């Protein structure tokens, strides 16, 4: 029937079987709204559960992932170092780890991209967080030795050299992609990842490709590509298209980061 005002109510917490666990404290709440028109929705916000339950407290650590540099790092903290932090937090009986955003922030390929809150995607992670030891070894001994020297140089710095770390980590990833990319992209795991994330992965890869092609992140300067069009994006990212070698590399980076 029709709801009449004033309406009295209370909040309660239920378990998975919808059985009441805890009613909130104090007197009933009172809701007194003016009459609504058909189809009108009224939202009452700012409400909170009133209780005398003790507040949950714990110890934890707050740190940007890029600061978690270890001997296995490549000049900047990465996901491999984050796993080491998880082990340390557990050993020290902490319960929470809070990190700064890890989203991709690449717009200029310079150190101005290092600000972690300037994300270009809410889904894509920054390629610099790829753990190269976890990614795999390069088969070419000369290239492996070259990157080992660069790793030692960057790890020996007192502070993170953002541009150099990102540059050489991406170069390593490209070498590894040339070596193993075709095999990785043909796996069922990768195909499943792509199917589940295509809605954001394809536009993200297209954006990165066009940003680098036009040498600017200002999409208004991308000529015929300045207006977003799904069909154009799908054509650009087509397996048969000339851009696909770079597009597939961008897919590969996100696959590695998310799995």
Please report, for each region that a protein language model flagged, where it lies by residue.
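The feature marks proteins involved in alpha-glucan
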Residues: 2-58, 113-131, 136, 149
